[in-house]
């Protein structure tokens, strides 16, 4: 049997099926594109789910993939076993071939058997198969194609060999292929009491989708039968490399050996498990970050944080005191970056996120471990750690519950889950009460009461700029009132419906006017509470307003239009950032104002000037193309079917708004937008900056505000031209000449200062103060460059063998200290020590330097009056 590398196994599988007319489909993101029911892609068929159900058509009916997959949440949570068993992983690759109404059982079995025995050269006597106990058709094909007798075809009655997509939908029997590692390894055949051993390992699973489950009692034949298969790359490689543990294959060993070279701990004993955990979790963390997941305390981000912190704890066990994971990333990119180019594209970003998270957790890890050690000192095997302590570790020290359990695993100590969950619920309740009790607490509670009594506010603003609405609540000074009578009173107004957009999704709220038969009201802002109550922030301008009255609500159309153009530009910008900076870019926050937009993204380094220019060009090209902006209300289900992104963890109403801009962007969005991209006019980035680790902020303007910006810049340019008496064609030359002349003048001034500070030996003898046989020159000089002072002081100490020079200069409440000592006396007087002591005396943090020359700082100018006394004391003691 030939020995294959991991890369060769993957390549041969794909090449084999491509040669058999299968289309090679690239791996999808770990984040399911259209499936809020899944946290992560956990199998090869996920990206084809809609194809299997008939909701989507592809230009091919046979496919082959190598799909990156992750199981570390929900029912597929293998985290606690990873590193300790031979085959559990968080991240793994699933090889698969698929048929959508083309071939079925016989051909699928033939393809599998031929690949395994001819291409991979597996011994036939090492292979066994299972079939569903009623699937005689599959059994007969195994006999025909593989020549198996009944004793090598194992019939399984359980649902392990019958797959379904859910309570209803496509389903069918499975056939699994097992490899026998040999009798020297414990384990029994599938279906026996010893089946959980490691001797017989499943290497391939084939699902024959031939039925549709109508309800729990009704199952019918599908008119179009399909094939879904999965082969774990790591398992198959282990077989082909003659090892029984996935962590012993070449890919993992490369990472493990690379790690050993850094931490310098032998791969043996308990350390072996830590190396395996780190290798697995490095892959999972890196691929998740590459696909846009950032460590956080909720959703996918929290799963990533759990994985990373488990790896960090094992790095700590290996004695690694500094961040480790990011140092291993280059090896992973080298091993897998060619197959998954997203790793290469996002390498610097992944590296920065790994390092930042490790630094963050290092600060609490040791303290948390100390607490855990103290709390478990009296616990023995079979005991239980209290839920309160587990929660404290989670809440105070950032220990995910499964990390605490992992630490206690070897001691056979469990955690009181029930009490832990009670503590979690209590915290959520405290948070809710705290929220209700913070700020305008009385008003906060009112939103719950209003929603319970009146329900949600109906938003009319997608189609109407003004509408007749009924006043249902008025709030003044945090209290519900029946009417508002005092002119210029500020209050909150809620109506049954409104064309005013309440601030949400980053878009600021509308402004405008409300008119009733007796009043005129200015709306200065519109807010949204509890996700669905639209609240108008108002000022009474004329008359009075009462609950129950009808009024005409009219938005400021110009203000709304400016919001529209900046919101639509944000969508285009997001799409272009993906193209220019990479697929790792995810939205971390946004603000859509009438005069500008702000967009925060995950990106670990500054966006270059060249990238900014390219982004602007691409956004403006899409604007000029004048694509239609289709804003459609539909059900969430229909939106997802059309390909709109459904974000995991987001709660959507039964009706959502899908915003489509040509072929550029398709997003679920509740905001307001232009009708065509050309309505935006133009786009200009005004600033780019860092706001947090791994997060950049882009600000931009659109339409008339670009023109305004250009006019301001043009006006500034003309003012500069006028001041410098030049024109724009010669401006750069003029400025460069001025800068060059300024440098020359600075050098000349430096010479003047040096000459002014220079003293002859006779002048030194005359001006210096004698202290215990050494000469001291001290001077305080306003606003002089440190470089000049350093040079001047050093020049003097070279002229006289027993001289100490101390210069202090002040600028904006900051003091700079320069100390120079003649080299002949540096055995007794150290410039660094003198500078440090003076710095501390003047409120600085100390300083230092060479024995003959040192500089330091201070900020207490008031103590300068006593500085000579301090100097005398220092030199007398010396």
Curated annotation (Swiss-Prot):
Record's subcellular location: Cytoplasm
Signal sequence range: none
Gene3D superfamilies for this protein: 2.40.30.130, 3.10.310.40, 3.30.54.20, 6.10.250.550, Bira Bifunctional Protein, Domain 2, Threonyl-trna Synthetase, Chain A, domain 2
Alphabetical UniProt keywords: Aminoacyl-tRNA synthetase, ATP-binding, Cytoplasm, Ligase, Metal-binding, Nucleotide-binding, Protein biosynthesis, RNA-binding, tRNA-binding, Zinc
EC number assigned by the record: 6.1.1.7
Cofactor(s) this protein cannot do without: Zn(2+)
Listed Pfam families: DHHA1, tRNA-synt_2c, tRNA_SAD
Keyword RNA-binding: yes
Biological process according to GO: alanyl-tRNA aminoacylation; negative regulation of DNA-templated transcription
CC terms in the record's Gene Ontology section: cytosol
Binding site for Zn(2+): 567, 571, 669, 673
Catalyzed chemical reaction(s): tRNA(Ala) + L-alanine + ATP = L-alanyl-tRNA(Ala) + AMP + diphosphate
Molecular function as annotated in GO: alanine-tRNA ligase activity; aminoacyl-tRNA deacylase activity; ATP binding; tRNA binding; zinc ion binding
Entry comment, domain topic: Consists of three domains; the N-terminal catalytic domain, the editing domain and the C-terminal C-Ala domain. The editing domain removes incorrectly charged amino acids, while the C-Ala domain, along with tRNA(Ala), serves as a bridge to cooperatively bring together the editing and aminoacylation centers thus stimulating deacylation of misacylated tRNAs.
Family matches, as HAMAP family: Ala_tRNA_synth_B (MF_00036_B)
Reported function: Catalyzes the attachment of alanine to tRNA(Ala) in a two-step reaction: alanine is first activated by ATP to form Ala-AMP and then transferred to the acceptor end of tRNA(Ala). Also edits incorrectly charged Ser-tRNA(Ala) and Gly-tRNA(Ala) via its editing domain.
Stated family: Belongs to the class-II aminoacyl-tRNA synthetase family.
UniProt-recorded name of the protein: Alanine--tRNA ligase
Source species of the chain: Rickettsia felis (strain ATCC VR-1525 / URRWXCal2) (Rickettsia azadi)
Organism placement in taxonomy: Bacteria, Pseudomonadati, Pseudomonadota, Alphaproteobacteria, Rickettsiales
């Amino acid at each position: 049997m030939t020995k294959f590398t991991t890369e060769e196994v993957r390549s041969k599988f794909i090449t084999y099926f491509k040669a058999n007319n299968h289309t090679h489909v690239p791996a999808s993101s770990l984040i399911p594109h259209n499936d809020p029911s899944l946290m992560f892609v956990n199998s090869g068929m996920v990206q084809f789910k809609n194809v299997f159900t008939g909701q989507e058509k592809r230009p091919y009916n046979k496919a082959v993939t190598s799909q990156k997959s992750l199981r570390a949440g929900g029912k597929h949570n293998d985290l606690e076993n990873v590193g300790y068993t031979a085959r559990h992983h968080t991240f793994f690759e699933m090889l698969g071939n698929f048929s959508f109404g083309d071939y079925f059982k016989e051909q699928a079995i033939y393809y599998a058997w031929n690949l395994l025995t001819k291409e991979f050269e597996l011994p036939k006597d090492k292979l066994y198969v299972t079939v569903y106990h009623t699937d005689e058709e599959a059994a007969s094909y195994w006999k025909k194609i593989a020549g198996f007798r009944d004793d090598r075809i194992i019939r399984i009655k359980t649902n392990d060999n019958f797959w379904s997509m859910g309570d209803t939908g496509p389903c069918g029997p499975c056939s699994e292929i097992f490899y026998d590692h040999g009798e020297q390894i414990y384990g029994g055949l599938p279906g026996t009491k010893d089946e959980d051993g490691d001797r017989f390992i499943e290497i391939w699973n084939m699902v024959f989708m031939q039925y549709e489950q109508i309800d729990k009692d009704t199952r019918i034949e599908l008119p179009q039968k399909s094939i879904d298969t999965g082969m774990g790359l790591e398992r198959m490689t282990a077989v082909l490399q003659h090892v029984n543990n996935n962590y012993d294959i070449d890919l993992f060993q490369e990472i493990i050996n690379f790690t050993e070279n850094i931490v310098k701990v032998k791969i043996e004993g308990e350390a072996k498990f830590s190396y395996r955990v780190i290798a697995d979790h490095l892959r999972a963390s890196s691929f998740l970050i590459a696909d846009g997941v950032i460590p956080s305390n909720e959703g996918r981000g929290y799963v990533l944080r759990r994985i990373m912190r488990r790896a960090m704890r094992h790095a700590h066990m290996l004695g690694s005191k500094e961040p480790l994971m990011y140092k291993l990333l280059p090896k992973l990119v080298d091993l897998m970056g060619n197959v998954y180019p997203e790793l290469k594209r996002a390498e610097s970003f992944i590296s920065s996120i790994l390092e930042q998270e490790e630094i963050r957790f290092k600060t609490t890890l040791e303290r948390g471990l100390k607490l855990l050690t103290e709390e478990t000192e009296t616990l023995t095997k079979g005991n239980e750690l209290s839920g309160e302590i587990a929660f404290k570790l989670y809440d105070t020290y950032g220990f995910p519950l499964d990390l605490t359990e992992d630490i206690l695993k070897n001691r056979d100590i469990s955690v009181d889950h029930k009490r832990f969950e009670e503590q979690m619920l209590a915290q959520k309740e405290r948070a809710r009460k705290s929220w209700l009790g913070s700020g305008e607490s009385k008003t906060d509670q009112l939103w719950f009461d209003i929603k319970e009594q009146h329900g949600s506010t109906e938003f009319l603003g997608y189609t109407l700029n003004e509408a007749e609405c009924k006043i249902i609540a008025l709030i003044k000074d945090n209290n519900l009132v029946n009417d508002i009578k005092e002119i210029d009173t500020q209050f909150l107004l809620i109506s049954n419906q409104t064309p005013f957009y309440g601030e949400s999704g980053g878009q600021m709220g509308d402004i405008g006017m409300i008119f009733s038969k007796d009043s005129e009201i200015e709306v200065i802002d519109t807010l949204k509470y509890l996700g669905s109550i639209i609240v108008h922030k108002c000022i009474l301008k004329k008359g009075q307003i009462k609950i129950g009255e009808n009024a005409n609500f009219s938005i400021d159309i110009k203000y709304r239009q400016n919001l529209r153009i900046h919101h639509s530009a944000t969508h285009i910008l997001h799409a272009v950032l993906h193209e220019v900076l990479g697929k790792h870019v995810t939205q971390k926050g946004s603000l859509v104002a009438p005069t500008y937009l702000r967009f925060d993204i995950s990106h670990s380094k500054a966006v270059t000037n060249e990238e900014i220019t390219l982004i602007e060009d691409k956004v403006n090209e899409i604007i000029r193309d004048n694509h239609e902006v289709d804003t459609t209300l539909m059900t969430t289900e229909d939106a997802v079917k059309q390909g709109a992104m459904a974000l995991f963890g987001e709660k959507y109403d039964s009706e959502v708004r899908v915003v489509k801009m040509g072929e550029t962007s398709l997003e679920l969005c509740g905001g307001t937008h232009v009708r065509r991209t050309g309505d935006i006019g133009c786009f200009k980035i005004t600033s780019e900056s860092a706001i947090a680790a791994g997060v950049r902020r882009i600000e931009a303007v659109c339409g008339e505000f670009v023109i305004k910006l250009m006019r301001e810049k043009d006006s500034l340019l003309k003012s500069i031209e006028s001041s410098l008496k030049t024109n724009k064609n010669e401006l750069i030359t003029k400025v460069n000449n001025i800068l060059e002349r300024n440098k020359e003048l600075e050098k000349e001034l430096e010479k003047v200062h040096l000459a002014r500070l220079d003293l002859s030996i006779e002048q030194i003898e005359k001006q210096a103060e004698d202290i215990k046989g050494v000469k001291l020159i001290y001077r305080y000089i306003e606003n002089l460059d440190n470089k000049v002072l350093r040079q001047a002081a050093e020049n003097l100490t070279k002229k006289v063998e027993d001289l100490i020079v101390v210069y202090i200069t002040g600028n904006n409440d900051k003091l700079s200290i320069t100390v120079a000592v003649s080299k002949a006396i540096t055995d007794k007087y150290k410039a660094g020590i003198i500078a440090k002591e003076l710095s501390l005396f003047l409120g600085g943090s100390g300083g230092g330097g060479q024995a003959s020359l040192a500089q330091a700082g201070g900020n207490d100018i008031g103590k300068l009056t006593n500085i000579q006394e301090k100097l005398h004391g220092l030199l007398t003691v010396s």
